[in-house]
């Protein structure tokens, strides 16, 4: 009998329950190697119940802003591939309107499956409020991408005023400008989005009606600085690097960071088409785990300089790295002589439960969109939040990532939130919050 035949006979002996000790040891070693490889590819037992993601890729959109860093890092550092998703494409979008349109299309229609997105947008898209013919496209929020990190900037024509949280001097200046026959405008990035709500809140708190006293216009983030340069607007709200670039080009200055309006406020989310998540739940979990791991990496201060360098690359934001680095590392030069080192309002990707999508925060965004007429007063916010906000998937992913139980919120609410002007939002009574606001488009 040949050696080959003997080796084959030995391997088949297990069928008779007579595997030799040597064969058993070899088989055990092989199994251990396979398990080790599986753990390396899918740490935390993410796919212990199956063979891994149903598909190897997804198309994810982003806008050229620093709070998309977790997507950049997950791609650059091979984290998507680590979780079995090597074919993920992270695609730049020209505007939030483009992001919306491509989410409606889905990747099967040459669009995208998910995105770095303004937190209110999945609700506006799911409800059909901002889609063509008001046809809803169901969306899920899988994670929050960051807290804080946005700013409101004003043009250098207001340099002497050194405008900050108090808009009283700005109001007087705007009234004088309007009286001279000139238009006054405030720019944001998408109607009903976070930047729209921050600048509206700030203006209204100081008695400036954002619909009557000033014209509120939409400008894509990457076009903010160029538009301010030619005098298109008097103020704008956007994420970095555009506020710092404005200062570097001597076109304007930072009036305030949005964290000064609302400390540790939620900002962007990782949103996915519900159809993708429902069809490919394991792939969606893999994407979520990769993004969460990237958030943890971005949060570490020792990684912030590299995060800034990644952001500055041509395929991502495409700006000089000096427009990114300081604020990514927590240094805020307002362009007025005011400099804050290690700002408490710097962007957070993981610390302070930045990644968990509190449902109470989504309720605030919807309540503000009711305030400004994006939804009717009787809109059923809690019902749509229950459908769109998938904090349950976040918790599941967090457990498989090994996140400590103490770092996984026990409640879907962060409780009452207090704003810079003393207003309090109680998620148990949003109607009372609406009633407390003076300037609004809804009776409450």
Tell what function each PLM region has.
Residues 152-153, 269-272, 276-277:
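Short glycine- and hydrophobic/aromatic-rich loop-to-beta-strand nucleating segment
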Residues 20-40:
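N-terminal export leaders
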Residues 9, 363-444:
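Conserved C-terminal helix/tail region of periplasmic/extracytoplasmic solute-binding proteins
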Residues 112-114, 212-254, 273, 305, ...:
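Ligand-binding pocket segment of bilobal, Venus flytrap-like solute-binding proteins
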Residues 1-23, 47:
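N-terminal secretory signal peptides
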Residues 280-392:
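Secondary-structure end/capping motifs
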Residues 49-211, 215-218, 230-244, 251-264, ...:
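Short, glycine-/small- and polar/acidic-enriched structural segments
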Residues 40-49:
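Signal peptide processing junction and immediate N-terminal pro/mature segment
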């Amino acid at each position: 009998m040949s050696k080959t035949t003997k080796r084959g006979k030995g391997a088949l002996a297990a069928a008779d329950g007579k595997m030799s000790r040597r064969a058993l040891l070899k088989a055990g070693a092989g199994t251990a190697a396979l398990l080790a490889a599986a753990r390396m590819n899918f740490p935390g037992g993410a796919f212990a119940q199956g063979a891994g993601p149903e598909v190897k890729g997804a198309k994810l959109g982003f806008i050229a802003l620093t709070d998309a860093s977790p997507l950049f890092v997950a791609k650059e550092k091979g984290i998507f591939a680590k979780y079995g998703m090597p074919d993920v494409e992270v695609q730049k979008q020209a505007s939030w309107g483009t992001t919306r349109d491509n989410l409606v299309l889905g990747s099967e229609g040459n669009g995208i499956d998910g995105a770095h997105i303004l937190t209110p947008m999945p609700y506006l898209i799911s409800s059909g409020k901002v889609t063509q013919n008001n046809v809803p496209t169901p969306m899920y929020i899988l994670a929050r991408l960051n807290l804080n990190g946005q700013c409101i900037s004003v043009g250098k024509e207001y340099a002497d005023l050194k405008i900050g949280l108090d808009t009283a001097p700005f109001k007087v200046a705007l009234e004088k400008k309007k009286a001279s026959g000139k238009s006054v405008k405030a720019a944001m990035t998408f109607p009903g989005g976070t930047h729209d709500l921050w600048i509206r809140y700030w203006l209204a708190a100081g008695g400036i009606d954002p619909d009557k006293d000033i014209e509120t216009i939409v400008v894509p983030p990457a076009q903010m600085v160029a538009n301010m340069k030619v005098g298109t607007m008097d103020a704008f709200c956007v994420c970095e690097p555009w506020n710092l670039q404005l200062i570097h080009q001597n076109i304007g200055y930072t009036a305030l960071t949005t964290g000064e309006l609302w400390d540790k406020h939620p900002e962007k989310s990782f949103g996915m088409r519900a159809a993708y998540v429902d069809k490919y739940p394991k792939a969606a979990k893999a994407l979520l785990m990769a993004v969460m791991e990237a958030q943890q990496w971005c949060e570490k201060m020792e990684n912030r300089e590299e995060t800034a360098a990644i952001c500055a690359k041509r395929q991502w934001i495409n700006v000089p790295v000096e427009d990114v680095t300081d604020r990514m590392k927590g240094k805020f030069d307002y362009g007025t002589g005011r400099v804050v080192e290690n700002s408490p309002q710097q962007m957070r990707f993981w610390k302070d439960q930045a990644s968990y999508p509190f449902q109470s925060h989504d309720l605030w965004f919807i309540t503000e969109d009711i305030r400004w007429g994006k939804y009717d007063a009787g809109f059923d916010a809690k019902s749509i939040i229950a459908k769109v906000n998938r904090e349950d998937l976040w918790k599941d992913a967090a457990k498989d990532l090994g996140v400590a139980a103490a770092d996984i919120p026990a409640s879907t609410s962060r409780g009452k939130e207090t704003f810079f002007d003393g207003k309090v939002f109680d998620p148990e009574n949003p109607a009372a919050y609406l009633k407390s606001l003076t300037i609004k488009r809804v009776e409450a």
